[in-house]
Amino acid sequence: MQDDPRYRVEVEVSPRFLAHQSTPDEGRYAFAYSIRIQNAGAVPARLVARHWQITDGNGRTEQVDGEGVVGEQPWLRPGEAFHYTSGVLLETEQGQMQGHYDMVADDGTEFIAPIAAFVLSVPRTLH
């Protein structure tokens, strides 16, 4: 059902570095990411699960799977959006995340909402 326009969810991500929660000397780099999930289809749908692939700057990859997001399984009418913020710790100054959400439409159709890869990076300071 991925190509059926009735079942379409758009995902926008805004990552940021959390300097105050990071300890670079210990290899701990904290990042937050704010996500906007919008039902761009024609059928109400519920986000039931998340699947993330997190890769650090050394190429180490971790898979994270779970029910819903931030303790919720949001139900979205057509045009409706859900926002949340979460975070991740890396051992390197940069990395990336990508993944998808498992969705179930009110008519029972299961489909995937892809999350394009986005970069997590410590901003550089110019001197």
From Swiss-Prot:
InterPro entries: ApaG_domain, ApaG_sf, Uncharacterised_ApaG
A GO BP annotation: error-free translesion synthesis
Pfam families: DUF525
Annotated ranges, domain ApaG: 3-127
Domain of life of the organism encoding this protein: Bacteria
NCBIfam families: PRK05461.1
Protein name: Protein ApaG
